[in-house]
Curated annotation (Swiss-Prot):
Record note on quaternary structure: Heterotrimer of A, B and C subunits.
GO CC annotation terms, alphabetical: glutamyl-tRNA(Gln) amidotransferase complex
The keyword Nucleotide-binding is assigned to this record: yes
Protein name as annotated: Glutamyl-tRNA(Gln) amidotransferase subunit A
């Protein structure tokens, strides 16, 4: 097996045992990126020179017997809306095309302390607004399983990079499903932690009450390790919760026979038959090891998407007001201040961003605040209450991650409602602030399908426990079809 094909834990063990050096590993990763990037287009920015220099330094420290962090010498990709000091953070937008942050996001500082090496910044939907990574201002990222299809979004670059074996670990952000949906589409594992578990400091905000940073990796074990690294209270983030963080890897390999697993019926009614069949088949496969299955109902789910697409754009319209050409980012050259504001935003923002900002501004306007935004907040409260009620009876919920398999590039570009429906199974979890992980559960016509395990607030451990057991029992990749990427020279 080539170095770039190894999982995060395999890489970690190999480095610690001296089977290969960090420089060899990082070189292998960049060779793989060079080999596949023309077909995938996962990266906006690569940091090869810095990464190789860092790998040599870590190899030197390891040779001297110095104490190193848990991710020392391991390459990681970062979604391009997470601030990286001295490395461009564009949010896949023209308005921030040349923006270089003067500081690191807290999660980047935590990765640095752990010894991780950043190999580049991944493509995304502009300002994380989208479900296909087609809204990037620069280029469209492709799905490694079929390069004519989308990888999902908005963290499509991160998911595609892990799926195509460019890196063992990537970070993304999840506002309404932006880690889990691309994880499902690309056949990788993606986790949205509880709101407040991972610091948002340094994440360029889309919707501040919904955004959460999380990992994407090749398996649940790797995700648990990554979550251990990036979790924890941060005084720089007022929404960060000061709770002790458990060792999430301790929950691996634990039995689930005493747990009650809820099956939310509404989620299964909202998805295509092939997706539904695969998730239900997975439930049957793990039944001998599982505890009790309980059919549960979350009736407000049918209104969740409407509430989400009022609350998120409303918050975005406020957050994106800071991009005005005055302090940072692109600026339209003119002597008139009003013209500068208007033209900077007109030329700097893409159509989807403008559309959502306008929708959010409308929802917050005096005549519609009560009828739209306030009502959406009430629906959000109902969704939270329903989850609380269900979790008084269940330990976790298992549901489909996405309603469909990956769709073709361009198929839904002119149909925003169909595009927005991709979030129907994921957005309610963000509205409730709960943890959820998407794991592969099979293939439909050669395309990956994911299921998600949803847990109680700050109970990521149980989510990982159940997801790992499912992963072990399904062994999805034992008889997996060949990636379309492999037929295009990306072997």
């Amino acid at each position: 097996m080539k170095l770039h094909e190894l999982t995060l834990m395999e890489v970690k063990r190999g480095l610690e045992q001296g089977d290969f050096s960090s420089e060899e590993l990082v070189t292998s990763v960049y060779d793989r990126i060079e080999e596949t990037e023309d077909h995938i287009k996962a990266y906006i920015t690569l940091t090869k020179e810095q990464a190789l220099a860092q790998s040599k330094e870590i190899d030197s420290q390891r040779a001297k017997g110095e104490e190193l962090g848990p991710l020392a010498g391991i390459p990681v990709a970062i979604k391009d809306n997470i601030c990286t000091k001295d490395v461009t953070t564009s949010c896949a937008s023209k308005i921030l095309e040349d923006f270089v942050p003067p500081y690191n996001a807290t999660v980047i500082s935590k990765l640095a302390e752990a010894g991780a090496i950043i190999v580049g910044k991944t493509n995304m939907d502009e300002f994380a607004m989208g479900s296909s990574t087609e809204n990037s201002a620069f280029f469209v990222t492709s799905n490694p399983w079929d390069t004519e299809r989308v990888p999902g979004g908005s963290s499509g670059g991160s998911a595609a990079s892990v799926a195509s074996a460019q890196v063992p670990l990537a970070l993304g952000s999840d506002t309404g499903g932006s880690i889990r949906q691309p994880a499902s589409f690309c056949g990788v594992v993606g986790m949205k932690p509880t709101y407040g578990r991972v610091s948002r400091y340094g994440l360029v905000a889309f919707a501040s009450s919904l955004d959460q940073i999380g990992p994407l990796s090749k398996n649940v074990e790797d995700t648990a390790l990554a979550l251990d690294i990036i979790s924890g209270h941060d005084h720089m983030d007022s929404t960060s919760v000061d709770l002790e963080v458990p060792n999430h890897t301790d929950f691996l390999n634990q039995d689930i026979d005493e747990l009650t697993i809820g099956i939310p019926k509404e989620y299964y009614e909202l998805v295509d038959n092939d997706v539904k069949s695969l998730v239900e088949s997975s439930l049957q496969s793990i039944e001998p090891e599982a505890g009790n299955y309980r059919q549960v109902s979350l009736p407000t789910t049918e209104h969740a998407l409407s509430a989400y697409y009022l609350i998120a754009p409303a918050e975005a319209s406020s957050n994106l007001a800071r991009f005005d050409g005055v302090r940072y980012g692109q600026r339209f050259a003119t002597d008139d201040l009003k013209t500068m504001y208007n033209q900077t935003r007109k030329e700097g923002f893409g159509n989807e961003v403008k559309q959502r900002v306008m929708l959010g501004t409308y929802a917050l306007s005096a005549g519609y605040y009560d009828a739209l935004y306030l009502k959406a907040l009430k629906v959000r409260s109902l969704i939270k209450q329903e989850f609380e009620q269900v979790f008084s009876e269940c330990d976790v919920l298992i549901a489909p991650t996405t309603p469909t398999v990956p769709f073709r590039e361009g198929e839904n570009v002119d149909d925003p409602l169909t595009m927005y429906k991709n979030d129907i199974c994921t957005a309610p979890v963000n509205l409730a602030g709960l943890p959820s992980i998407s794991i592969p559960c099979g293939f439909s016509n050669g395309l990956p399908v994911g299921l998600q395990v949803i847990g109680k607030a700050f109970d990521e451990g149980k989510v990982i426990q159940v997801a790992h057991k499912i992963e072990q029992m399904l062994q999805v990749f034992k008889n997996a079809p060949q990636q379309g990427l492999d037929n295009q020279g990306g072997k």
